[in-house]
Amino acid sequence: MNPNQKIITIGSICMAIGTISLILQIGNIISIWVSHSIQTGSQNHTGICNQRIITYENNTWVNQTYVNISNTNVVAGKDTTSMILAGNSSLCPIRGWAIYSKDNSIRIGSKGDVFVIREPFISCSHLECRTFFLTQGALLNDKHSNGTVKDRSPYRALMSCPIGEAPSPYNSRFESVAWSASACHDGMGWLTIGISGPDDGAVAVLKYNGIITEIIKSWRKQILRTQESECVCVNGSCFTIMTDGPSDGPASYRIFKIEKGKITKSIELDAPNSHYEECSCYPDTGKVMCVCRDNWHGSNRPWVSFNQNLDYQIGYICSGVFGDNPRPKDGKGSCDPVNVDGADGVKGFSYRYGNGVWIGRTKSNSSRKGFEMIWDPNGWTDTDGNFLVKQDVVAMTDWSGYSGSFVQHPELTGLDCMRPCFWVELIRGRPREKTTIWTSGSSISFCGVNSDTVNWSWPDGAELPFTIDK
């Protein structure tokens, strides 16, 4: 083959390759156009149905590698219209308690990014229930978890996440800088109360829908503190209780009425022989009932009930089935403070039904272990130690902690009554488990049902120590 023939042959091959490449490019353009037309047609069809599509992305990090677990398209059909929560309904009749949520946050936190927390609580709007919690500005199994047994620090913050989920940086919403807190929804927006600052000058910051609306300064300069559970909203007004003063003697207790984040009224309780801390409150037929912790001298729980004008009544649960911890053995109760083992205490709750009362308490008399619900049909007014129903939810051998009430309004459930619910904190780590450098907790929750339920144990279940502890 002479040089001219070689040139012609090479040129022909190049032209053939170029032609094939051009055909492939044209085919690619046609394919993209067809695909786009199909997608556009699908979107137009969705628009005709007048539905909104929300894409939920579930992502995580595994050993520093980003993994997209799932992308799920969900048709959002729930009405998000705002409405004022009336709070006028009575509590639903119940026979027991059904498990509602369990977040397993300590177990998950041994390998995943989960916040170190304490004082979790639950509050519901007319659309959803959320878990609120006080972080320590640290993650489990990380060096900054060291020393998180401390209650009050500038690193603590109130955050929230969907109920039943382990609180992590990826699903949690910042609410307020706080080492003591409360939150509730009036049907129009979230009210959050976050207390932070020095012991002798703490400040409560009130926010409504995330905007600062009011400030409350410590009036006794002795650790201003609030409920560590949900506040209560009735007919557009929200109510909360704060304490300022000694934890082992008479202190100052104030009820605040708040509308859209602004304080409209407040009163101080005249209760020189009572002690109110960490109150668990709920609405009942337009009034507010709070069952609290007496850290001074009562092993039975104090209560305060008030209407929307803040006219109030006070007392102690009379039952000989004692609700605090530490406490004596059940026996003879009193409608005044029961002084036996009355010092110290733990946050708790009860639900009043006429003269009867559902009492939530640790199973242990002396340590924060186990949890049970007891129905005393005459316990609000009578002092005997008899009861009719006991339901176990955490075994005596497993750690518990704080507990508190929350309700689900008829606007959420569709019922014609207020559904009573409660949560239990499952504390792990220090000071009891000294193999760890940290203190944190997970949570479980239950709601009242008018049907048979079951005795069982839903413990935290994490195996300690973690890698950071070794």
Swiss-Prot record:
Involved in apical transport and lipid raft association as annotated region, ranges: 11-33
Cofactor: Ca(2+)
Record: glycosylation sites: 44, 58, 63, 68, 88, 146, 235, 365, 455
Protein residues bound to Ca(2+): 294, 298, 324
Annotated catalytic residues: 151, 402
Pfam families the UniProt entry points to: Neur
Residue intervals passing through the bilayer: 7-27
Reaction catalysed by this enzyme: Hydrolysis of alpha-(2->3)-, alpha-(2->6)-, alpha-(2->8)- glycosidic linkages of terminal sialic acid residues in oligosaccharides, glycoproteins, glycolipids, colominic acid and synthetic substrates
Record carries keyword Hydrolase: yes
This protein's GO CC annotations: host cell plasma membrane; membrane; virion membrane
Side of membrane Virion surface, spans: 28-470
Subcellular location: Virion membrane; Host apical cell membrane
GO biological process: one example: viral budding from plasma membrane
EC number(s) from the headed UniProt entry: 3.2.1.18
Ranges in the topological domain labelled Intravirion: 1-6
Coiled-coil residue spans: none
Disulfide bond residue pairs: 92-417, 124-129, 184-231, 233-238, 279-292, 281-290, 318-335, 421-447
Post-translational modification: N-glycosylated.
Membrane topology: Single-pass type II membrane protein
Regulation: Inhibited by the neuraminidase inhibitors zanamivir (Relenza) and oseltamivir (Tamiflu). These drugs interfere with the release of progeny virus from infected cells and are effective against all influenza strains. Resistance to neuraminidase inhibitors is quite rare.
Function: Catalyzes the removal of terminal sialic acid residues from viral and cellular glycoconjugates. Cleaves off the terminal sialic acids on the glycosylated HA during virus budding to facilitate virus release. Additionally helps virus spread through the circulation by further removing sialic acids from the cell surface. These cleavages prevent self-aggregation and ensure the efficient spread of the progeny virus from cell to cell. Otherwise, infection would be limited to one round of replication.
Domain text: Intact N-terminus is essential for virion morphogenesis. Possesses two apical sorting signals, one in the ectodomain, which is likely to be a glycan, and the other in the transmembrane domain. The transmembrane domain also plays a role in lipid raft association.
Family of the protein in this entry: Belongs to the glycosyl hydrolase 34 family.
Name of the protein this chain belongs to: Neuraminidase
